[in-house]
Amino acid sequence: MELFIPRGTEKSAALAGIKKLCVAAHEDDIELMTLGVLGNMNPAEFAGAVATNGASSPRTGRFAGVTDEEMVLLRAEEQKKVAEAAGYGALALLGYTSADVKTESRAAVEKDISELILATSPDEIYTHNPADRHPTHVAVFCRVLGAIRSLPPEKRPKKLWGCEVWRSLDWLPGAVRTVVDSEKGTELASTLLPMFESQVEGGKRYDEAYIGRQRANATFAESHSTDEFACASNILDMTVLITNDRLDPCDFLYDVIDMFRRETKKTLDGAMK
C-alpha cells in the first residue's frame, strides 16, 4: 500500500485530521462517488483509498497503445494530481488487481483497509453500494464491510454509506436514501475529473456524465415540488451492516429492494383501480 500525503503535510498530523474516508475500486471512483460530500467539507479532513491498480482500464485515441504496466503508473499519477489539486488529507493506493480483490487476496485487501481505518479513525466511510453493476465495485464493498467488521465496535466508523457509480440510486426508498447537495461538488468536477486524462480522453467522458447525473438527481427527485438543490447525490445508508454483524449484506439489500417493490406496487395498484 502506497500512502500519499498531498501538500507535504506531516504524515501523522494529516492522518489524525481525517474525518471521512472513501474506499473505491478504481482511480476516479473516489471523485465519482464523493465529490458531493467533498464539496461541503474541509478537504484536508477527507481521505481516499483506491483498491485496484487500474491495469484493465479501457483505452482509445492517444492512449490506445498504452500497455497495462504503463496504465498502472499513469492512473496512479493522475489520482495523485487530483488529490493534490483537491487538497485531500491523504490518499492510499492499495495496488491490487481486480482478481485479488474478488477472490485471490481477499484477506490481504481487508487487512490493508482495516489498517487504514485504524490509522485515520474516520467518523464516516463511503464506498460502493452492493447494487452496483460492476463486479469489482461490489467486491470492494464486501472487502470494506469485512475490514470494518474485523475491528472492535469502538474502532469502527459511526456511519457507512453506499454511493452511485455503475447504477444510479434514485430508485431507493426514502427510508434508506440520503440526498446530498452536490452543487459545490459538481463545480469541483469540472476541474478535477478532466485530470483523469487516460479516461475522459480515452473513451469514457466521466466528467460530463457525473455532472449530468447530479443535475438529473436534483430535478427528478420530486415530481410535485420545485427543486430543493441544483445538483444532488443519492447515497445509501448502510450503517446497520456495521452495527449488526449478523446481518447478511444480501438480506440487507433484499430488504431495500422489497421496500422498493412495495412502494411501486402501491402506486401501480392505485392507478389500476
Which functions belong to the PLM regions below?
Residues 1-21, 103-273:
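Metal-dependent de-N-acetylase/amidase catalytic core
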Residues 16-70:
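ATP-dependent adenylation/pyrophosphate-handling site
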Residues 44, 89, 123:
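Short acidic/polar active-site loop segments enriched in Thr and Asp
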Residues 51-53, 82-97:
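A conserved beta-strand->alpha-helix junction
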Residues 54-57, 100, 169:
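Feature marks short, surface-exposed loop/turn motifs that line or immediately flank catalytic pockets
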Residues 66-74, 104-108:
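Alpha-helix N-cap and loop-to-helix initiation/capping positions
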Residues 72-80, 141:
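Short, surface-exposed alpha-helical segments at coil->helix boundaries
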